[in-house]
């Protein structure tokens, strides 16, 4: 399954140790932020992209923790030298 360039960028950050944190207002998602492994905020994540990655089961959250990349997400992301 092919993934878009924006999805590829986010998955690369997550493969290197990043995370996606969400803020909720009630049940609705209010804010989505992607953090790199160094703690910097990556601005390229919006609600639509987040839902696409979730639908493809490339990211997952467990026990209320931030979203991380899954095994399936690692298979979807193309390897680059800095991700190995």
Swiss-Prot record:
InterPro entries: YjhX_toxin. It comes from the Bacteria. It holds the Pfam family YjhX_toxin. Belongs to the UPF0386 family. HAMAP family: UPF0386 (MF_00827). This is UPF0386 protein R01313. It comes from Rhizobium meliloti (strain 1021). The lineage of its organism: Bacteria, Pseudomonadati, Pseudomonadota, Alphaproteobacteria, Hyphomicrobiales.
């Amino acid at each position: 399954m092919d993934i878009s360039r924006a999805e590829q960028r986010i998955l690369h950050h997550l493969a290197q140790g990043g995370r996606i944190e969400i803020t909720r207002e009630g049940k609705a998602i209010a804010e989505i932020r992607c953090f790199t492994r160094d703690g910097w905020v990556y601005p390229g994540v919006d609600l639509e992209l987040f839902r696409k990655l979730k639908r493809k089961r490339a990211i997952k959250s467990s026990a209320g923790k931030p979203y991380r990349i899954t095994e399936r997400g690692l298979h979807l992301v193309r390897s680059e030298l800095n991700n190995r």
